Amino acid sequence: MSRSNSIYTEDIEMYPTHNEQHLTREYTKPDGQTKSEKLNFEGAYINSHGTLSKTTTREIEGDLDSETSSHSSDDKVDPTQQITAETKAPYTLLSYGQKWGMVAILTMCGFWSSLGSPIYYPALRQLEKQFNVDENMVNVTVVVYLLFQGISPTVSGGLADCFGRRPIILAGMLIYVIASIGLACAPSYGVIIFLRCIQSIGISPTIAISSGVVGDFTLKHERGTFVGATSGFVLLGQCFGSLIGAVLTARWDWRAIFWFLTIGCGSCFLIAFLILPETKRTIAGNLSIKPKRFINRAPIFLLGPVRRRFKYDNPDYETLDPTIPKLDLSSAGKILVLPEIILSLFPSGLLFAMWTLMLSSISSGLSVAPYNYHLVIIGVCYLPGGIGGLMGSFFTGRIIDMYFKRKIKKFEQDKANGLIPQDAEINMFKVRLVCLLPQNFLAVVAYLLFGWSIDKGWRIESILITSFVCSYCAMSTLSTSTTLLVDLYPTKSSTASSCFNFVRCSLSTIFMGCFAKMKAAMTVGGTFTFLCALVFFFNFLMFIPMKYGMKWREDRLLKQQRQSWLNTLAVKAKKGTKRDQNDNHN
């Protein structure tokens, strides 16, 4: 009696949410019976179309002689059937809960970057008196922090994409702690300006690199939720910083602010050193591969249960990105000058710069008539903005993920029906930016009302409500823009994220530097009216990349491929000419 194996393979297209644990598939066994089987999608991977797929191979072993003789003999033996499933290695070994744990760790690291600027605002008046400087001079320390907050990530992002996320984050936090100690003990105003630059250079890259980390362990259908949450939670320091700074300054003095930053960031540094894993896919794959360099290894992976959970003894080497990373410190600039990128980011950066002015206006506007609020009460007035930012980062991520799933499903259906070419790619600019437009136009109205509320001394409720809406829109804008960049450049996600960081911080620096003169010339209400008009106009520019962005990218790719082909031909021709010359010489 002979035995035979029957093998077939199927490719399953899936669009699961985190609570869809299985899919059911039907198949026919050798005895003719139809069976159903639940398939776990832990081994799912992203296919060339950007959708989640899983390849399952079943081997059905049975007694085929018994099956063929079943019609001629009643004394037959039931076939022994064995079903095994072989799947591709999972994209990441992190569970859904562990992904949120990573978001918490990244928020803990990057929070100190956004906190470093607003926590300093309540101390400005004390610095003026202690060091005998005027308002313009004391604002220099605010401007230089914002300036290096935009410049530093464009360099550090390239380092993180080359050498790994973990060492750059840890190095930045350590520099921040050392600079904060120096600021707490600073003897002169010149030292404060210098150390504020160092402080910003150290911690600023953590925001962009955090988005790169999230891009390492998420797929497109879930990326909006996690990137949005990380980006939004990290920047909540700008909402609550003034409240914390006001309490510390009122209870002690301005030096207490920097001791607080030293202790807080130092504690987070120790936690991150112990548990933050390396996620760069060229180094760690799906987290099952042990990094070669010691600095890329988290000590927690020395524990037996953690090693077994992340398969350190049986790594999935096929998940290792074969791309050899090359250090290119100008890569952020090369991305930023692309027309579809700058047209997508500039309106959002302008909106975010207005949010920075709004936070500054609350501090300065509520401290004078007709409000004359105490420093701590002003800090409490930042709470609605903090809550709005928290809601904006959380809900927007889920909204853009839901919209992406719906659009990719329709896209695949149209492709299957022959309505679009099989090699077509979904328009990521349109899928992401269409979610950005409503909140950007809503923000124009909110900022306009906020500016005139401060200017005319309207009831405090109007200021609190509009600051809530403005913060919601600002965090929504940040989440969507960052997600778009990670989608477009998954292998350079830290560098790409730093582009928006550069745009928003550069614009914030310019407007903060000009804000005092603009208020003197146009009043607060007039200043916000002018900026709202700019945002309203530039919002329409986003329709250009929505329509032409993918075409421009495809044209550049074809041009690069053509140039590469010509270079290859030139090299071969040169070698052939040299060979002919050698033959003639011989």
Curated annotation (Swiss-Prot):
The keyword ATP-binding does not apply. The chain crosses the membrane at residues 100-120, 140-160, 167-187, 189-209, 226-246, 256-276, 335-355, 375-395, 434-454, 460-480, 524-544. Residues 1-44, 61-82 are annotated as: Disordered. Pfam families: MFS_1. One of its GO terms (molecular function) is transmembrane transporter activity. The keyword Transmembrane applies. It is found in: Membrane. One of its GO terms (biological process) is amino acid export across plasma membrane. PROSITE patterns: MFS. InterPro entries: MFS, MFS_dom, MFS_trans_sf, Sugar_transporter_CS. Residues 121-139, 188, 247-255, 356-374, 455-459, 545-586 are cytoplasmic. One of its GO terms (cellular component) is fungal-type vacuole. It is a multi-pass membrane protein. Keywords: Membrane, Transmembrane, Transmembrane helix, Transport. Residues 19-40 have a biased composition (Basic and acidic residues). Residues 1-99, 161-166, 210-225, 277-334, 396-433, 481-523 are extracellular. It comes from the Eukaryota. Probable transporter that confers resistance to short-chain monocarboxylic acids and quinidine. Belongs to the major facilitator superfamily. CAR1 family. This is Probable transporter AQR1. It comes from Saccharomyces cerevisiae (strain ATCC 204508 / S288c).
